Amino acid sequence: MGNCRSKQESHPICPNTQTPEPTEAEFRRAAVNSLYGRYNCKCCWFADRNLINCSDHYLCLRCLNVMLRTSNLCNICWKPLPTRISVPTEPTAPSE
């Protein structure tokens, strides 16, 4: 029963190991107001500050780090996660 081995073809684990192009997202310190209120992290639903735009939703930095540890795809939209973050210069005082 378990003594004979079946012929198995040797398949490489990752035949096409290509590094995906880094995707860039914009960092938001405060969430943008929308018609239905403030945006939140779509993963934990608690964070409304320090959000990263991921295709059609926002993720907080904590959830983004957790997702990047396991995979390079988003668990919500199944698109590549942003790996580069661009921080726009935000004014600290109103312009005169």
Curated annotation (Swiss-Prot):
Residues 1-10 have a biased composition (Basic and acidic residues). Belongs to the arenaviridae Z protein family. This is RING finger protein Z. Keywords: Host cell membrane, Host cytoplasm, Host membrane, Host-virus interaction, Lipoprotein, Membrane, Metal-binding, Myristate, Viral budding, Viral budding via the host ESCRT complexes, Viral release from host cell, Virion, Zinc, Zinc-finger. It holds the Pfam family zf-P11. Myristoylation is required for the role of RING finger protein Z in assembly and budding. Its main location: virion. Gene3D superfamilies: 3.30.160.310. One of its GO terms (molecular function) is RNA binding. Plays a crucial role in virion assembly and budding. Expressed late in the virus life cycle, it acts as an inhibitor of viral transcription and RNA synthesis by interacting with the viral polymerase L. Presumably recruits the NP encapsidated genome to cellular membranes at budding sites via direct interaction with NP. Plays critical roles in the final steps of viral release by interacting with host TSG101, a member of the vacuolar protein-sorting pathway and using other cellular host proteins involved in vesicle formation pathway. Residues 1-21 are annotated as: Disordered. A motif (PTAP/PSAP motif) lies at residues 91-94. A lipid is attached at G2 (N-myristoyl glycine). It comes from the Viruses. One of its GO terms (biological process) is viral budding from plasma membrane. Interacts with protein NP; this interaction probably directs the encapsidated genome to budding sites. Interacts (via RING domain) with polymerase L; this interaction inhibits viral transcription and replication, Z partially blocks the product exit tunnel for the releasing nascent RNA product. Interacts with the glycoprotein complex; this interaction plays a role in virion budding. Interacts with host eIF4E; this interaction results in eIF4E reduced affinity for its substrate, the 5'-m7 G cap structure. Late-budding domains (L domains) are short sequence motifs essential for viral particle budding. They recruit proteins of the host ESCRT machinery (Endosomal Sorting Complex Required for Transport) or ESCRT-associated proteins. It is found in: Virion; Host cytoplasm, Host perinuclear region; Host cell membrane. A zinc finger (RING-type) spans 41-77. GO terms for cellular component: host cell perinuclear region of cytoplasm; host cell plasma membrane; membrane; virion component. It is a lipid-anchor.
